[in-house]
Amino acid sequence: MDFRSSIRNTSPIVTNLIIINSLVFFAQMAFGGMEPMSKVNDLFALHHYKSDAFRPYQLVTHMFMHGGFFHLFLNMLGLWMFGGLMEKIWGPKRFLIFYFICGLAAAVAQMANYTYAYWGIDHSILSNEAAAYFQEIWLRNATIGASGAIMGILAAYGYTFPNTQLFIMPIPFPIKAKWAIIGIIAMDVFGGIANSSKDDIAHFAHVGGAIAGFLIVLYWNKKNKTNFY
């Protein structure tokens, strides 16, 4: 049996998502979308709702853009490793809906973080000009990547297969999935609180996607549901 054909037949959504994300990445490179202030990012990355660059469709389009090859590679690797199995269990339609809900939840969480930072600037210790300057900086921030949706998949995997042993580099011994996922989420929470946007990682988007993924599978299991619809 042809291996590539087997993958397409068993995980069509995962396969197509990887293809689409890869094609979008090549399009980004071709049209200058790797630059933070590029027109491509203005149009399709997720901006704060008060930004002049914000468009509602960015809640979806940002999920298909990436900031570099390594960013794309890690997200697609996680999608392939964990998403393929979840798609086989749930079926393509259910998996696709799950994926987009987690991605949208990640966008909402990141938007909430932007809003908190925007309104949290202390006007009592800054001049009006300085406060306006820092608020303008926040309005220029933009989020891209499928990481929030991938974190939702990881959370679902950790809930569904909590005792599966995972090898995570550079840790030299296996870790149960439930502890690995909890550890990753905890690092994102800490990273978001400690660093805000200074490391260019949308930590709260990751957390939002993970929480959405966990709540969805928790609801399914409690209600013994087989569909969203």
What annotation goes with each model-predicted range?
Residues M1-Y229:
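A detector for small-residue-rich transmembrane helices and their helix-helix packing motifs
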